[in-house]
Each structure stands twice: as structure tokens, then as C-alpha cells.
Regions:
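A glycine/threonine-rich phosphate-anchoring loop and its flanking beta-alpha core
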Residues: 113-206
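Oxyanion-binding "anion nests"
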Residues: 204, 208-257
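ATP/NTP phosphate-donor binding region
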Residues: 16-98
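Small-residue-rich helix-loop
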Residues: 267-269, 273
Length: 336
């Protein structure tokens, strides 16, 4: 059986490709720094049918059928999923076939859930094109859609065969989208790997946008944090909840803003909020609270939200999937 040379998978010979194993219910690897089209060939061989799912505005040059879904959070609805199911049926995909998800976190969330639910589970490969997708949405096997009651309330755990991270996608992103993705990277620094925060010391958003070596190091470290946590607690029964740092308020802000605020922007605000709350409770030092503000402001991320919205935000947070017995629960940190 032909296998693609690992050397030919490299997007840029100046860097070494990084591989991060994820030992979930089905072990797979996250490949970072590869040429996604070359790496994808390994997964296309021997497949009778392959269908790609991507967003409406996205153009991909693949000689396979492509299902388009609406851009942004509008693509994560029951109505969109129903249409995807219809198209999968028209293409007559069966359990031996493959779904390829090419896009940001909303695409990998929706496509992964389509793969999880079609014929009770078929294979899929994630090709994230945003930083948020690379370090968060595409890694860990969480798939799903939103409902009228909140974000990500309907879904399944269904790991991909592989996650293929081609860093050249970052050049296609706006500064705002780079910043939003970096919020998830910063989160990994605060919850687990302080080296991420050290790498970002005295770095601006422009530095992150232009420094490919820095991108590789940051994404590799953030993926490694999530992979280690997911490998220990795949179905979020205890440790994995730490990945929701900043997300309880963050998800509420997204919903309140009708998703005008990016996921990462909302998470940045959520991290500042819980850092302040932790300091009030006496479990986090003022210096670490200030470090939140320094890093997030340097990346041009928001650190506050409209005060008058708080009653509505409390209502949304009560519906958060981490809430128990009617109590809103936050993930907090006490140190790095």
C-alpha cells in the first residue's frame, strides 16, 4: 500500500512537522505543519465515496462532492444538519465512506456531528482553517450544533481519524480572526502550560500574524495541552471541564450578541471575569489577574462587556451544560 513520504508532507522545510497523539476512545494523531492536500491523500485511498463539508464562502480545490453550509454560527443549526443529512443520502454514503471537514470550528463541529449521526457513525477527517479550529474545535472529538436555548447543547463525542493542521491557512485570516483564535491558545497557557504565556511575553498581535515559527510553537503547545486532557477524560466527567475556562460567561456573551462577537473574543472576556472573581475569592493573585489583561490586550482582544446585559447573561449561564442542580458553575484557576 502506497504511503506519502513524511518529508513531502511538510509545508515548509525550515520547520519540522509536529505530531501530537490523542488517546481517546479511538486513538488518532494531530499533524501540525503539513501540506494538507498531500497528507489527505493517505485517507482518500481505498475509499469508495468521500464528501467534503465546508462553509458557503470557502473555495476548496478537491475532486470530490462538496456540501456547503452557512458561514459562522448560522451553520450550526438543526435545519442545516437536516440539509446535510439529505445531501449525504443523495450521495449514498455508507459506513465505509468518509467525510472531510474543511473550515473553522463551526464547520468541524457540524461535520463531525453529521459523521457521528449518519448511519450511527462514519469516519471523518478534520482540516481546520482557523486558529480556534486548530487548537480547540477540531481536537478532542466534541461535535455538535446550537439550539434556541444555547450553544453546543446538542451533540456527540466522535473522534476524527486525523486532524491535519496546515499553518498556511493562517495567512488567509483577518487580524480579528487571528486574535479570536489566540484566545484559546492563551487559555491553554493559563490552565496548563505557562510556557505559552512566556512565548507571548512582549508580543503583539502583528508579531503572531507574521512569525510562522511562533505560530508553530504556540499551536503545538496548545494542541498538546488539549490532547493530554482529552486523553485522560474524553467525555468531560472531571478534568476536561478545565478546558471551559472563560467559556461559561463567554458562551452567554456570544448568544447575547447574536454571535456578532467571535467565540474567542467572548472567551477572552470570560477569562478576565473569572480571574477577577477568583481574586475576590482570594484564590488568584492580583498579579495573575493583571497578566490576563496584559496578554489579551496585546492581542487586541476585548476584556469587558456591557454591564446592563448581566441579568440576561445570568439567564443564559443557567442553561450552560456545566450547570448542576440549578447552580451556575465556573472553571477557575488558582495558579499557573
Amino acid at each position: 500500500e502506497r504511503k506519502v513520504s513524511r518529508r513531502n508532507r511538510f509545508r515548509d522545510s525550515r520547520f519540522f512537522m509536529r505530531t501530537v497523539p490523542v488517546n481517546a476512545e479511538r486513538a488518532y494523531q494531530v499533524e501540525i505543519g503539513i501540506d494538507w492536500k498531500v497528507a489527505l491523500n493517505d485517507w482518500l485511498e481505498g475509499r469508495n465515496k468521500v464528501v467534503a463539508i465546508t462553509s458557503a464562502s470557502f473555495q476548496i480545490d478537491l475532486n470530490i462532492p462538496v456540501i456547503k453550509i452557512p458561514d459562522g454560527e448560522a451553520g450550526k443549526s438543526a435545519e442545516v444538519l437536516l440539509q446535510v443529512w439529505r445531501e449525504l443520502g443523495q450521495y449514498e454514503l455508507n459506513r465505509g465512506d468518509l467525510i472531510i471537514a474543511v473550515g473553522g470550528g463551526t464547520v468541524t463541529d457540524l461535520a463531525g456531528f453529521a459523521a457521528a449521526s449518519w448511519m450511527r457513525g462514519i469516519d471523518w477527517v478534520a482540516i481546520p482553517t482557523t486558529i480556534a479550529g486548530m487548537v480547540d474545535a477540531a481536537v478532542g472529538g466534541k461535535t455538535g450544533i446550537n439550539s434556541e436555548h444555547g450553544k453546543n447543547l446538542i451533540g456527540a463525542f466522535h473522534s476524527p481519524l486525523s486532524v491535519l493542521i496546515d499553518l498556511s491557512w493562517i495567512k488567509t485570516l483577518s487580524e480579528r480572526d487571528v486574535a479570536a483564535g489566540m484566545a484559546e491558545v492563551v487559555k491553554c497557557g493559563f490552565i496548563s502550560d505557562g510556557n505559552i504565556l512566556d512565548l507571548l511575553k512582549n508580543k503583539s498581535l502583528k508579531d503572531v500574524c507574521n512569525d510562522e515559527k511562533l505560530q508553530l510553537e504556540l499551536i503545538h503547545k496548545a494542541v498538546s495541552v488539549k490532547a493530554a486532557i482529552v486523553s485522560t477524560d474524553f467525555k468531560e466527567s472531571f478534568l476536561r471541564e478545565i478546558l471551559n475556562y472563560g467559556h461559561t460567561l463567554g458562551h452567554a456573551i456570544e448568544k447575547h450578541s447574536h454571535f456578532d462577537i467571535r467565540h474567542g473574543e467572548a472567551v477572552a472576556i470570560g477569562m478576565c471575569f473569572i480571574a477577577e472573581l477568583s481574586a475576590i475569592k482570594g484564590i488568584l493573585s492580583p498579579a495573575l489577574v493583571e497578566r490576563h489583561y496584559e496578554i489579551l490586550k496585546a492581542l487586541k482582544l476585548p476584556i469587558s462587556y456591557e454591564k446592563l446585559a448581566f441579568p440576561d447573561l445570568l439567564t443564559y449561564m443557567a442553561l450552560d451544560k456545566k450547570s448542576k442542580n440549578g447552580q451556575i458553575r465556573f472553571v477557575a484557576i488558582s495558579d499557573i
